From Swiss-Prot:
It comes from Homo sapiens (Human). Disulfide bonds: none annotated. Keywords: Cell cycle, Cell division, Centromere, Chromosome, Chromosome partition, Kinetochore, Mitosis, Nucleus, Phosphoprotein. This is Kinetochore-associated protein NSL1 homolog. GO terms for biological process: attachment of spindle microtubules to kinetochore; cell division; mitotic sister chromatid segregation.
């Protein structure tokens, strides 16, 4: 259909401008923001510069009347310092974030010079002081020796009294010598008796373990082999005696015979011996 009308859509111009504005904002947000602040390396140097410029700001207030001079200068000084602080960066940091401990090249140079002076001073003292110390030590030792030479201790003499008549002292010594001689002689006389007693005591001490051992053996073997009860008739023996009225009495030695028992192991340890009984004693 050739005669039919065609529809044409026309975009308003303000829509194109809005779209272009949104695209430019997106590009700005995507690209990193450029820092237009002045880059500095030392906060201390900037502070010194502000103090130097503050003098010129003070001179600008000379033309103002006195009523408004002081507040106007204070506001101008604050505005100037704030503007400088906002438009500079200290090592990439803002003024408030930067620290005051940054050293300038001049400060480092001064510190290096002071350090070199200290090293030279220490090296000089190391060479000079040992000699001075040695001299002082030698002088001190010599002074001590001189003091010891001048020291003389005070010695008070002791008065010794001489006795012109030594006879009483000789008599006293003689009496004491006789007494000591008597005591020594008595001690020498009693010495053999003491030696004999000591030997007897030592023999008793040596026999004590033997007696104790014999008792132990006797108890052990008597418990192993117990003898039967013997009748009292076996122990009765007739003993011939003479009456006490007779003047002459014959000595008679009689042997008491025990009843022989069978051989047992304790015979080896304790053999029986015939015992003689003397009736005269």
């Amino acid at each position: 259909m050739a005669g039919s009308p065609e529809l044409v859509v026309l975009d308003p111009p303000w829509d194109k401008e809005l779209a272009a504005g949104t695209e430019s904002q997106a590009l700005v947000s995507a690209t990193p923001r450029e820092d237009f602040r002045v880059r500095c390396t030392s906060k201390r140097a900037v502070t010194e510069m502000l103090q130097l410029c503050g003098r010129f700001v003070q001179k600008l207030g000379d033309a103002l009347p006195e009523e408004i001079r002081e507040p106007a200068l204070r506001d101008a000084q604050w505005t100037f310092e704030s503007a400088v602080q906002e438009n500079i960066s200290i090592n990439g940091q803002a003024w408030q974030e930067a620290s005051d401990n940054c050293f300038m090249d001049s400060d480092i140079k001064v510190l290096e010079d002071q350090f070199d002076e200290i090293i030279v001073d220490i090296a000089t003292k190391r060479k000079q002081y040992p000699r001075k110390i040695l001299e002082c030590v030698i002088k001190t030792i010599k002074a001590k020796q001189e003091i010891l030479k001048q020291y003389h201790p005070v010695v008070h003499p002791l008065d010794l009294k001489y006795d012109p008549d030594p006879a009483p002292h000789m008599e006293n010594l003689k009496c004491r010598g006789e007494t000591v001689a008597k005591e020594i002689s008595e001690a020498m006389k009693s010495l053999p008796a003491l030696i004999e007693q000591g030997e007897g005591f030592s023999q008793v001490l040596r026999m004590q373990p033997v007696i104790h051992l014999q008792r132990i053996h006797q108890e052990v073997f008597s418990s192993c082999h117990r003898k039967p009860d013997a009748k009292p008739e076996n122990f009765i023996t007739q003993i011939e005696t003479t009456p006490t009225e007779t003047a002459s009495r014959k000595t008679s030695d009689m042997v008491l015979k025990r009843k022989q028992t069978k051989d047992c192991p304790q015979r080896k340890w304790y053999p029986l011996r015939p015992k003689k009984i003397n009736l005269d004693t």
